[in-house]
Amino acid sequence: MLRLPTLLPLKPSPPTTGLNPIHGRRHGHHPSRLLASSAPPPPPPRPPKPEPRTSHENLGDDTPDFPTTKPRKPRRGRRSEAAAVEDFVRGRLEQVFASIRERDPEVLEGKGDILKRKEELSDEEGKEGTGEEEGELKAVVEEEDPSWPLDADIGWGIRASEYFDKHSIKNVTVDGVEIDWEREVEEGWVKEINCLEWESFAFHPSPLIVLVFERYNRAADNWKFLQELEKAAKVYWNSKDRLPPRTVKVDMNIERDLAFALQVKECPQLLFLRGNKILYREKELRTADELVQMIAHFYYNAKRPSCVNPEAIAPPC
């Protein structure tokens, strides 16, 4: 027995959009027929995009070919600027010489190459990555050049050896004693210090004697005061029953800030210090015996000598 499919009632379709409903018919007027569609009209076709052209392709018959490699930028710097100036001057000089040859060719005959030939580096040395500027000239004279002059000319046709043999530098001699500051630095008993070493010497409880001097202003007085101080220091260094004082010297022309801090305006001047405090200033030249008595008074509780001014002594703390 065959079964027929179940027949369902058809659903009414919805009204079409875009149709104006007719509410009623008027006498003598016929309804206008409107045709509408539910689907929108298709969009117009877009024009095709032009294909991009590469740099190596020709744009046309009239357009020249583009380079396949990017040109290197010119180097900038002192060397390149100097080379540009040299090229400019060289070009102008060549123009001047050319005009001179046109007017009177006999003037420059037999002169040879007036302009020096320009030295250029090879292509391998001038490539990037070598770290050197293009067109850099080679060294003029090598260190091991056999033609290097041993005695160079210092000007006006005078050799250095001839000048110093004729005008020798000699130390000043005072009272038959030669003033040799260079030897004093190496072999002297009084050490010369600078402002960086001052704190390590001053901030110490042991006795300290400072001589502020000048090498080239009143050199005789400064040298004599230094020699007397060395003799007095040797006396205490040779004695075994007491600790000798420390003795240093400061050049006023070199250590200006330190001399200003010590309030020293005239040289030579001797300062007696203890614990970063100035006990006494001696501005006059004293002999070694007088300095021994002054050191004993300030540091070893000895009797005050007559050469010490009691009013100039710093008061005790």
Swiss-Prot record:
Residues 23-32 have a biased composition (Basic residues). Residues 1-83, 114-138 are annotated as: Disordered. GO terms for biological process: chloroplast organization; regulation of DNA-templated transcription. The keyword Plastid applies. Its main location: plastid. Keywords: Chloroplast, Plastid, Transit peptide. Residues 121-135 have a biased composition (Acidic residues). One of its GO terms (cellular component) is chloroplast stroma. Residues 1-10 have a biased composition (Low complexity). Residues 1-69 form a transit peptide. SUPFAM superfamilies: Thioredoxin-like. Residues 48-59 have a biased composition (Basic and acidic residues). It is found in: Plastid, Chloroplast; Plastid, Chloroplast stroma, Chloroplast nucleoid. Plays an essential role in early steps of chloroplast development. Involved in the regulation of plastid gene expression. Required for the proper function of the plastid transcriptional machinery and protein accumulation in thylakoid membranes. May function as molecular chaperone to ensure proper organization of the nucleoids in chloroplasts. PANTHER family: THIOREDOXIN-LIKE FOLD DOMAIN-CONTAINING PROTEIN MRL7, CHLOROPLASTIC (PTHR34669:SF2), THIOREDOXIN-LIKE FOLD DOMAIN-CONTAINING PROTEIN MRL7L, CHLOROPLASTIC (PTHR34669). Component of the transcriptionally active chromosome (TAC) complexes. This is Thioredoxin-like fold domain-containing protein MRL7 homolog, chloroplastic.
